[in-house]
């Protein structure tokens, strides 16, 4: 009977030791995971700071280019460059605020569409008016001359 108790107690001690070893391994692996997550957060933080610095530099460069082209007439090529810069600026802003950027793009599209509509209406109205004014001036010049 003593032998059964000795075997049972030794079995309990062995299982308790196995559990403690297993718990130690789990806690070590959890620490490793936590350390890896912390280092990844640090790397992401550094990467985020670098990206924000690059975005700030790009925005500054784009604003400088815009201000140099703003006060003089632009060629078609310069106009295309400015359009591309504006698109880059929108893309950079969309990285910071994706929801607001999509709203701005939609709002910008609607404004462009409305502007095109008004331009078409102006052409339809101004065309005949200018024709009438031109013919009236032509008639006056013929009468005077």
Curated annotation (Swiss-Prot):
It holds the Pfam family Bombinin. Residues 19-43, 75-122 form a propeptide. Keywords: Amidation, Amphibian defense peptide, Antibiotic, Antimicrobial, Cleavage on pair of basic residues, Cytolysis, Fungicide, Hemolysis, Secreted, Signal. Belongs to the bombinin family. Its main location: secreted. GO terms for biological process: defense response to bacterium; defense response to fungus; killing of cells of another organism. InterPro entries: Bombinin (IPR007962). The modification Isoleucine amide is found at residue 144. Expressed by the skin glands. The keyword Nucleotide-binding does not apply. This is Maximins 3/H11 type 3. It is found in: Secreted. Residues 1-18 form the signal peptide. One of its GO terms (cellular component) is extracellular region. The keyword Secreted applies. Maximin-3 shows antibacterial activity against both Gram-positive and Gram-negative bacteria. It also shows antimicrobial activity against the fungus C.albicans, but not against A.flavus nor P.uticale. It has little hemolytic activity. It possess a significant cytotoxicity against tumor cell lines. It possess a significant anti-HIV activity. It shows high spermicidal activity. Maximin-H11 shows antimicrobial activity against bacteria and against the fungus C.albicans. Shows strong hemolytic activity.
């Amino acid at each position: 009977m003593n032998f059964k108790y000795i075997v049972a107690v030794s079995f309990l001690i062995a299982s308790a030791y196995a559990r403690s070893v297993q718990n130690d391994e789990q806690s070590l692996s959890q620490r490793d995971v936590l350390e890896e997550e912390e280092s990844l957060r640090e790397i992401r933080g550094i990467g985020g700071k670098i990206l924000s610095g690059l975005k700030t530099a790009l925005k500054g460069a784009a604003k400088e280019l815009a201000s140099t082209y703003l006060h003089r007439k632009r060629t078609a090529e310069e106009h295309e460059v400015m359009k591309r810069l504006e698109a880059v600026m929108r893309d950079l802003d969309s990285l910071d605020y994706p929801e607001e950027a999509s709203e701005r793009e939609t709002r910008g599209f609607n404004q462009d569409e409305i502007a095109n509509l008004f331009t078409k209406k102006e052409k339809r109205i101004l065309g005949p008016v200018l024709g009438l004014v031109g013919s009236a001036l032509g008639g006056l010049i013929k009468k005077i001359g």
